């Protein structure tokens, strides 16, 4: 009887371990892990978008400030320095620098050189304004993308919370079912065997007591 109880107890422990494995390795848990990965990727992308937006806004401020300072300044401008400055600005933003071969010629008089440099500045000014418009457009698109990404993140978080809640409900339901259909019957069977053992022991005790009485009666005879 004792061996049977031990066997049933071991079987019960094995079934409980299997239940835990089924709970923690369920498809719902795998889906949640995948959702967490997607959320992390989306958050990373949002941060990159915000950094890019800040960079573009800084570039626009620098470009706009440079143009306004140049156009509103009443002081004489160092044309050569301004051309080099604006060319560096264009190169930093992936644009080709604007130069004129004639400005390197020593055969031109001062007025001709001024005209050449003025032409370079006008072309640079046109390119800078074009770059400003492109930056504004990229900024608007980035802001739209950022807004869409934030809405997507909110949607995913809501879906994730719903999936987690559903997963918890299904897990609790599964545990209750396992407990009702397997654990309780095993406990009932174990208790039944215990009662049978107790009854068997009581019978043995009664038989032993009866046997002692018979021995006493036999000894008296």
UniProtKB/Swiss-Prot annotation:
Could you list this entry's UniProt keywords, alphabetically sorted: Cell cycle
Entry protein name: Factor arrest protein 7
One GO cellular component term of this record is: endoplasmic reticulum membrane
Quaternary structure and interacting proteins, as annotated:
Component of a complex at least composed of FAR3, FAR7, FAR8, FAR10, FAR11 and VPS64.
More about this protein: Present with 1540 molecules/cell in log phase SD medium.
Q: Which gene encodes it?
A: FAR7
Q: What is the lineage of its organism?
A: Eukaryota, Fungi, Dikarya, Ascomycota, Saccharomycotina
Q: Per the UniProt entry, what species is this protein from, by scientific name?
A: Saccharomyces cerevisiae (strain ATCC 204508 / S288c) (Baker's yeast)
Here the disulfide bonds are none
Give yes or no: UniProt keyword DNA-binding: no
* Keyword Cell cycle among record annotations: yes
Role of this protein? Participates in the control of the reentry into the cell cycle following pheromone treatment.
GO BP terms, alphabetized: cellular response to pheromone; re-entry into mitotic cell cycle after pheromone arrest; regulation of cell cycle
């Amino acid at each position: 009887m004792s061996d049977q109880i031990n066997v049933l107890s071991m079987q019960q422990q094995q079934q409980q371990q299997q239940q835990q494995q089924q709970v923690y390795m369920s498809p719902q848990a795998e889906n949640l892990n995948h959702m967490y990965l997607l959320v992390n990727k989306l958050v990373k992308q949002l941060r990159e978008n915000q950094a890019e937006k800040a960079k573009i806004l800084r570039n626009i401020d620098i470009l706009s400030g440079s143009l306004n300072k140049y156009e509103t300044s009443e002081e004489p401008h160092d044309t050569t320095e301004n051309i080099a400055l604006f060319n560096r600005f264009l190169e930093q933003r992936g644009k080709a620098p604007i130069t004129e071969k004639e400005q390197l010629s020593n055969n031109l008089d001062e007025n001709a050189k001024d005209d050449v440099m003025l032409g370079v500045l006008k072309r640079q000014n046109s390119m800078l304004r074009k770059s400003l418009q492109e930056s504004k457009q990229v900024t608007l698109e980035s802001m739209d993308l950022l807004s869409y990404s934030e809405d997507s993140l909110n949607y995913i978080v809501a879906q994730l919370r719903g999936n987690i809640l559903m997963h918890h409900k299904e897990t609790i339901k599964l545990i209750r079912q396992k407990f009702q259909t397997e654990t309780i019957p095993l406990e009932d069977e174990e208790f039944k065997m215990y009662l049978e053992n107790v009854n068997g022991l009581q019978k043995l005790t009664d038989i032993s007591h009866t046997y002692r009485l018979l021995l006493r009666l036999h000894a008296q005879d």
